[in-house]
Curated annotation (Swiss-Prot):
Coiled-coil residue spans: none
Keywords: Cytoplasm, Secreted, Signal
Consequences of knocking out this gene: Deficient mice are viable, with no overt abnormalities. Female mice are fertile. Triple-gene deletion of OOSP1-3 in mice retains fertility but causes significantly lower blastocyst and reduced offspring number.
Tissue expression from the record: Expressed in ovaries. Highly expressed in the germinal vesicles oocytes and metaphase II oocytes.
Compartments where found: Secreted; Cytoplasm
Gene Ontology cellular component annotations, sorted alphabetically: cytoplasm; extracellular region; germinal vesicle
Pfam families, alphabetized: ZP-N
Family according to the record: Belongs to the PLAC1 family.
Signal peptide range in chain numbering: 1-21
Species this chain originates from: Mus musculus
Protein name: Oocyte-secreted protein 2
Length: 168
């Protein structure tokens, strides 16, 4: 009888822990300057399937920045929220932080979701698109030194004024 009672308690604890487990969908993306974390507002927990924005925090108490119908976004510079930076190589930098999830009413145990993202240190905006050896475009002989005279500008304005009066 003692063994079956102990087995029942273990099964009960396993079920209790399993029902408190949350399966949260998280998508992390980053650049050299920004980290974006998108969290689905729906979980796989059958008893409490909806996650509220005030239950989520990024790093050092940073709140959700955008609320959509089906997801929440954290968009922060990598220098905020305690986001840690690791230089992997001359070309790659890695950012690490945590997302904290504290459910409102159910299983009041705090859950910590580790997050990691890597980005290239070589910005496409800083790379040259052409070099000195690239051919230069030939200057067009058309309209290169065109300057409208005041008379020509007056004629253009008179034509526009006349056409706008015809539309009335």
């Amino acid at each position: 009888m003692g063994v079956s009672m102990a087995l029942e308690v273990l099964v009960y604890l396993a079920v209790l822990v399993w029902t408190c487990a949350w399966d949260i969908d998280v998508d992390v993306s980053c650049s050299q300057d920004w980290m974006t974390v998108s969290v689905s507002a729906f979980s796989q927990n059958k008893r409490n399937p909806y996650i509220f924005a005030d239950e989520l925090y990024l790093g050092q108490n940073c709140r959700v920045t955008q609320i959509h119908a089906h997801q929440y976004d954290f968009i922060y510079p990598v220098s905020h929220c305690g986001i840690r930076t690791k230089v992997i190589s001359n070309e790659i930098v890695c950012f690490e932080t945590e997302m904290y999830f504290r459910p409102r009413n159910y299983c009041l145990e705090l859950q910590i979701v580790p997050l990691q993202c890597s980005a290239s240190r070589k910005s496409v905006w800083l790379m040259p698109l052409s070099t000195e050896e690239d051919p230069k475009p030939v200057k067009s002989p058309f309209m290169t030194d065109f300057e409208a005279t005041p008379e020509e500008l007056g004629l253009l304005n008179a034509h526009q004024a006349a056409s706008s009066q015809n539309k009335r």
